[in-house]
Amino acid sequence: MKKQNENGRIPEDRLSRANKRKKINTIASILVMTGCLLVLVLVTYVAGILYSWIDSKFQNNANDLAAAAEAGSQTEESTQEVVKTYTQEEVDALIAEAKQQAEDEEENKILSGIRDGLTSGTTMVETLRPYYPNELVVVSNGTFNFVPIRDDLQKNDYVLENLNILEDGEVQYMQDGQVVSHKGIDVSKHQGNIDWTKVAADGVEFAFIRVGLRGYGTEGKLVEDEYFEQNVKGALQAGIKVGVYFYSQAITDEELLEEANLVLEKVKPYNIELPIVFDVEKVSGGKGRANELSVEERTRLTALFCQTIQDAGYKPMIYHNMEMGTLMLDLGQLEQYDKWFAYYNDDLYYPYAYKVWQYSEKGAVDGINEEVDLNIWFGDF
């Protein structure tokens, strides 16, 4: 152990050496710390360079793919197939969205068509009909009815393009450039005195003449048409083929047979070549006594009239309109009887079979001073 001097201090040479060692240690520590900082800075710099290089590569690839997609490139060098996966719920949602979009587009198309139809002056029912090809759109009591077209009923084969409408509104049916229909009228006391010679000269080939009617009030009295005899005689003398009709309001079998027997009695003296027609109509305004009949009751009474006429040796026929044929009669039970159909549009909308078409209630014919119903008979009598 070294001795201290008398003042308790380490001798000068030893102090000097101690200070030198202290300085050396301090310098070494500084150098170590400086080296560590340099290494850290170098690592950070290198990492930054690597990140920039990787990011540049990624960005370049992304730009290449975007450019290729925009240009429509399909090459393997510039694009990769993107595979998307969906859960069942996501697929269902996509389908529902597409379906809703299609429905919205179709709804807008339909609404646009309805708007165009109505603004052009077409009635609502006429506007709706093209959108329901498998149903008959029928207005009854202020409501729109969509009645499925029955496959079990006989259909007519009339072609719209074969209709020939003359300037005066007369309708003809053509085939191979030839008129194959016959011009006809139906009359009652409402037409007054008729010059049947002039009627024939105007091209009328047949006429349905009213025998009578049953009142649609509660009593339902039978009424004979006061012009029946003179109309039948005048038409036959002018060479016009004659059929007859009775406007029924029968609500029981007894009343129905009373009507049929009256008709048979009235036609007995004459040569009636064309059918005897059962005119079954709904009285507007809800006043008709037969309006409340069920479909089954009305169909049964109609069949009873036709069978009675047929049993007497005459040809029966049923007069009806769109409402009656779709909502108020079961035509399936009346298929064996010919039909006379009243419809005042020229679109041949009604699909079921009929031989005679009443196409106007406001016709004009020479020899008749009042408006008269116009008809055509399709094919041969």
Residues covered by each model-derived region:
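Surface-exposed substrate-engagement region within the catalytic domains
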Residues: 269-276, 280-381
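Functionally critical loop-and-helix segments that line ligand-binding/catalytic clefts
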Residues: 9-15, 113-184, 334-381
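Substrate-binding cleft of extracellular glycoside hydrolase catalytic domains
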Residues: 177, 181-299, 310
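Short, aromatic- and cysteine-enriched interfacial helices/patches
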Residues: 1, 53, 57-59, 118
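Juxtamembrane extracytosolic/periplasmic "stalk" immediately C-terminal to the first targeting helix
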Residues: 57-68
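Alpha-helical oligomerization interfaces
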Residues: 29-33, 40, 44-48, 52, ...
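N-terminal Lys/Arg-rich, disordered targeting/topogenic segments
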Residues: 1-27
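GH16 jelly-roll
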Residues: 33-38, 276, 280
